């Protein structure tokens, strides 16, 4: 079995694959202060709850945008799973030609998403990932990573309003039924969520105009379904896109 780690700034998403089939997925909070033993015990508990033992994990692959955790998870993999993990980074085979000015600047998560989207949906394709940041990636018909956009995510927007104002409260991001609202919390929720929908549709329209009017649009990440319900430009939501991308990259790099 393959254990895949998608390490984001807010959450770590893990997936257990048997061949091409995703058996289980888990989401935990990202904590840079946890040791490799703490992560090892936590992962053991999560997979064990689903009837999988440590010895059944043959390989590990890691994608991380949190540098301090990379070594932690690598050591954890060696100690608890007795395997050297594949790490998404320079030198890894992705099948994607990155056209960024400096390819090393592209986050591992964006590369993984691009690989999955092109493999599953073909090109041209646009990937929107609703994470700590909301990112947009453009992949050409030939599978070239053309670039994209990085915007503040929904939680960052909510936190900024709370932290940078004297009277606005901290809120949960639930969608109000109307855009116009009569209380502060719902008004903030409306501005952040419906404002994000407007941003998404405008940016996707501009992206299509710049590189491919027929581009397919796939969304992923924690808020993807909520935004897709209101968006006029998102074609599909794939919550497991990043994990699928890790599986594909693993298959292209396993010995």
UniProtKB/Swiss-Prot annotation:
<dbReference type="InterPro" id="IPR004619">
    <property type="entry name" value="Type_III_PanK"/>
</dbReference>
<keyword id="KW-0418">Kinase</keyword>
<dbReference type="GO" id="GO:0005737">
    <property type="term" value="C:cytoplasm"/>
</dbReference>
<keyword id="KW-0479">Metal-binding</keyword>
<dbReference type="GO" id="GO:0015937">
    <property type="term" value="P:coenzyme A biosynthetic process"/>
</dbReference>
<dbReference type="GO" id="GO:0005524">
    <property type="term" value="F:ATP binding"/>
</dbReference>
<feature type="binding site">
    <location>
        <begin position="107"/>
        <end position="110"/>
    </location>
    <ligand>
        <name>substrate</name>
    </ligand>
</feature>
<comment type="function">
    <text>Catalyzes the phosphorylation of pantothenate (Pan), the first step in CoA biosynthesis.</text>
</comment>
<dbReference type="Pfam" id="PF03309">
    <property type="entry name" value="Pan_kinase"/>
</dbReference>
<dbReference type="GO" id="GO:0046872">
    <property type="term" value="F:metal ion binding"/>
</dbReference>
<keyword id="KW-0173">Coenzyme A biosynthesis</keyword>
<comment type="subunit">
    <text>Homodimer.</text>
</comment>
<keyword id="KW-0808">Transferase</keyword>
<feature type="binding site">
    <location>
        <position position="100"/>
    </location>
    <ligand>
        <name>substrate</name>
    </ligand>
</feature>
<feature type="binding site">
    <location>
        <position position="132"/>
    </location>
    <ligand>
        <name>ATP</name>
    </ligand>
</feature>
<keyword id="KW-0067">ATP-binding</keyword>
<feature type="active site" description="Proton acceptor">
    <location>
        <position position="109"/>
    </location>
</feature>
<feature type="binding site">
    <location>
        <position position="129"/>
    </location>
    <ligand>
        <name>K(+)</name>
    </ligand>
</feature>
<keyword id="KW-0630">Potassium</keyword>
<keyword id="KW-0547">Nucleotide-binding</keyword>
<protein>
    <recommendedName>
        <fullName>Type III pantothenate kinase</fullName>
        <ecNumber>2.7.1.33</ecNumber>
    </recommendedName>
</protein>
<comment type="similarity">
    <text>Belongs to the type III pantothenate kinase family.</text>
</comment>
<keyword id="KW-0963">Cytoplasm</keyword>
<comment type="pathway">
    <text>Cofactor biosynthesis; coenzyme A biosynthesis; CoA from (R)-pantothenate: step 1/5.</text>
</comment>
<feature type="binding site">
    <location>
        <begin position="6"/>
        <end position="13"/>
    </location>
    <ligand>
        <name>ATP</name>
    </ligand>
</feature>
<dbReference type="InterPro" id="IPR043129">
    <property type="entry name" value="ATPase_NBD"/>
</dbReference>
<dbReference type="GO" id="GO:0004594">
    <property type="term" value="F:pantothenate kinase activity"/>
</dbReference>
<feature type="binding site">
    <location>
        <position position="184"/>
    </location>
    <ligand>
        <name>substrate</name>
    </ligand>
</feature>
